[in-house]
């Protein structure tokens, strides 16, 4: 994973995960933290796209918060680490960017990588809301058109 190929919003989303994990008392930074970050960063494209899929953004975020509150909690001064599932998303997002002809990894590539390889909890969440690659790409096309991230 080459962080220099990530857009500012992508870097912001990655960086926010540590605080989210800390706030929830989690040692492992996982896809739930990342999806929450993608949904709650300022001017979130992902939140906009979720709403374009006729999903209530606030309810969706509340469901992610529920997943976060169910994760194993630790106390004290602990070292945070990234889960294998989240690492896979971060690495595969570069492939998503290349597939779309983009030079940089943006938040939509990160979301597509998560849709392609969700962990168990995120897979169930996406299933509940009917979030699929095709549906996501369809709403993305209405926002992005044929622009690329270069």
What is each stretch, according to the model?
Residues 1-150:
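Histone-fold recognition with a strong bias for associated Lys/Arg-rich disordered tails
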